Regions:
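Long, low-complexity, intrinsically disordered polar/charged segments
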Residues: 1-8, 76-81
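Glycine-rich phosphate- or other oxyanion-binding loops that anchor nucleotides, phosphorylated ligands
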Residues: 58-100, 145-148, 152
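N-terminal glycine-rich anion-binding loop in soluble enzyme alpha/beta folds
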Residues: 6-65, 70
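Short N-terminal secondary-structure initiator segments
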Residues: 42-71, 126-144, 232-237
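Mixed-charge interfacial surface used for oligomerization/domain docking
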Residues: 2-4, 13-27, 32, 84, ...
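Short beta->alpha junction loops
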Residues: 65, 116-119
Length: 295
């Protein structure tokens, strides 16, 4: 049987569910993590609802990464049906999965291409959709990887953290700062360039946080992403952690304030991210997709 040219592969940090992956004709690696010393796989052995119930019970939660054996076996099986694999994991600055996968791929004779384009969540999902479009155009794995890495700076992420409890637990803020922040109901807004999360603002309410994030997006499309915005390729999505109702409201506010910006998705943040920030988070994610007309 003749092999198909290429398959796009990502991990569950993209927010793409297993059911959606089947519809798209791609492969999604379920990210592993440990809860109370037991291993779980996102969207396979645990649901979002079950995960947040564990968090409410103050379970011990830690993130992990796909094993070498798992990735190598997966690639071996995919290459029985496809000539090439393009793997788009979460940014190398936020997870060791990307660098490790690059090393594992060296033994696959140039048939596995690991992309590091600094993405996470809806921006990562946007990269997957671009990769799918490029594959349909007949581009090779090498060409897809080159394009995604060349355009890796065309994104922005702003996340309002709903509770300081999990930042404190992970050692990202001190106990004193968490106590003061919680007493004042402060909500930090974080951003990332793919290497680490940094605080860009501290606000007193969800309403203020949404306003601040929209302001940040407006600044981005007027400056750093002006050319892409004017071309009509910039997109925006909303992500959240167990905060769907507020996320839908945020979507409506964004569409009202930025009617010319293409809205894409309201998605839950991956459990790997939720481990560190807990429930109640809300995010605005700017991305770029030059091939939306081909979907």
């Amino acid at each position: 049987m003749k092999k198909k040219p290429i398959i796009i592969m990502t991990d569950s940090n993209s927010g793409i569910r297993q059911s959606e992956a089947k519809d798209l004709g791609i492969f999604v690696v379920p990210m592993p993590f440990t809860i109370n010393d037991e291993e779980y796989f996102e969207d396979i052995s645990i649901s979002q609802e079950e995960f947040y119930e564990f968090l409410r019970q103050d379970a011990t939660v830690s993130t992990s990464q796909p094993s070498q054996i798992y990735l190598e076996e997966t690639w071996t099986n995919l290459l029985k049906e496809y000539e090439e694999v393009v793997f788009i994991p979460m940014s190398s600055g936020l997870s060791a999965t990307c660098e490790n996968a690059k090393n594992y791929a060296k033994s696959f004779d140039g048939k596995v291409f690991v992309v590091d384009n600094k993405r996470i969540s809806c921006n990562m999902k946007e990269s997957v959709f671009e990769a799918i479009a490029l594959a349909k155009q007949g581009k090779t794995g090498s060409q897809i990887k080159a394009y995604l890495e060349r355009t890796s700076n065309l994104f922005a992420v702003y996340i309002m953290v709903g509770t300081l409890k999990y930042l404190k637990r992970g050692g990202r803020i001190s106990a004193a700062a968490a106590a003061i922040g919680s007493a004042l109901n402060l909500k930090p807004i974080l951003t990332t360039n793919g290497d680490k999360f940094e605080k860009v603002a501290m606000v007193l309410s969800v309403a203020q946080a949404k306003k601040k994030m929209i302001q940040k997006v407006k600044t981005d499309i007027e400056t750093a992403f002006k050319n892409e915005y004017e071309k009509g390729t910039m997109t925006i999505s909303v992500a959240h952690t167990e905060n769907l109702a507020e996320a839908e409201k945020f979507k409506a506010e964004i569409m009202k304030e930025l009617p010319n910006l293409k809205f894409r998705w309201v998605d839950p943040l991956s459990l790997s991210v939720s481990c560190h920030i807990g429930p109640g988070a809300l995010a605005a994610t700017l991305g770029n997709n030059a091939f939306m007309d081909q979907e």
